[in-house]
Design a protein with these regions (language model features):
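Conserved ABC ATPase "signature" region
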Residues: 80, 126-147
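C-terminal boundary and immediately downstream tail of ABC-type ATPase nucleotide-binding domains
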Residues: 239-259
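Conserved ABC ATPase signature
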Residues: 151-156, 160
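ABC ATPase NBD Q-loop/coupling interface
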Residues: 75-90
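Catalytic Walker B motif of ABC-type/P-loop ATPase nucleotide-binding domains
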Residues: 177-180
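Conserved catalytic motifs of ABC-family nucleotide-binding domains
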Residues: 173
Length: 259
């Protein structure tokens, strides 16, 4: 596999992907995918249904390795470090993934956050409580529950559960946080709170969001990766895509769906 060339004059991206290919049995679903994501930014991955967006996230987090008959290959670097030598658990601590419509663990809000903190070796109960409050506040949830972290996570609304699962992933302090269609099952008000939380997340890591919603991508993203048939067909700044490349890039992908 070709060596990834790095420009020493440029800041090292939080995530660098090159030559990523993925297969389900004999069917190839990703073809030589390459892109970068910077800390302090939100990268939206968009494209028609079935183009490989969710498979891309599964490869980055290696959950694809749990799928019978699936395989992948490619280069994934975190802050310039090759990840091939990392165990699945080590990688997943550094590349957090919140799936579409995630479900919190069926116990207290605090224990949901403590799950990730204990993975990092935090055992002191006071530190667990303080850290849980910090991450819940980061996603705008602490005030909504009046600071009662002992409440059952299953009592929360759909949007609140979504943000709790994001906070749980943040507790591992990942280099990159992957979000798969984070607002697909939420109402307008809940979607707005999740989008606001995403804007805060990029302060502590690179955020990669898969979304079918072009309006949402335009609201939250700093950069965009456009996919079609398993390939990256365009990538660049969000403003450039929606203001200059709308007809040349988006129209062929979305057709009549593009308003």
């Amino acid at each position: 596999m070709d060596e990834i060339l790095v420009d020493a004059a440029q800041p090292e991206p939080a995530l660098r992907v090159a030559e990523m290919n993925a297969f389900y049995g004999e069917r190839q679903v990703l073809r030589d995918v390459a892109f970068e994501a910077q800390r302090g930014s939100v990268t939206a991955v968009i494209g028609p249904s079935g183009c490989g967006k969710s498979t891309l996230l599964a490869c980055l987090n290696r959950t694809i390795e749990d799928v019978p008959g699936a395989r992948w290959r490619g280069d994934v670097l975190l802050r310039g470090e090759e990840t091939a030598c990392l165990s699945a658990d080590e990688l997943r601590a550094r590349v957090g993934l919140v799936m579409q419509q995630p479900t919190p663990f069926p116990f207290s809000i605090e224990r949901n956050i403590a799950y990730g903190l204990r993975f990092r070796g935090v055992r002191n109960r006071r530190r667990l409580r303080e850290a849980a409050e910090t991450y819940l506040d980061m996603v705008g949830l602490l005030g909504e529950i009046d600071g009662d972290v002992r409440r059952s996570a299953l009592e929360l609304s759909g949007g609140q559960q979504q943000r709790l699962c994001i906070a749980r992933a943040l507790a591992l302090e990942p280099d990159v946080l992957l979000l798969d269609e984070p607002c697909s099952a939420l109402d307008v008000a809940s979607s707005a709170t999740v989008e606001a939380a995403i804007g805060e997340l990029k302060k502590c890591c690179a955020v990669v969001v898969v979304t079918h919603n072009l309006a949402q991508a335009r609201r939250i993203a700093d950069s965009v990766v456009c996919m079609d048939a398993g390939r990256v067909v365009w990538q660049g700044g969000c403003a450039e895509l929606f203001e200059e490349k709308r007809e040349s890039v988006l129209a062929p992908l979305y057709g009549s769906e593009l308003l």
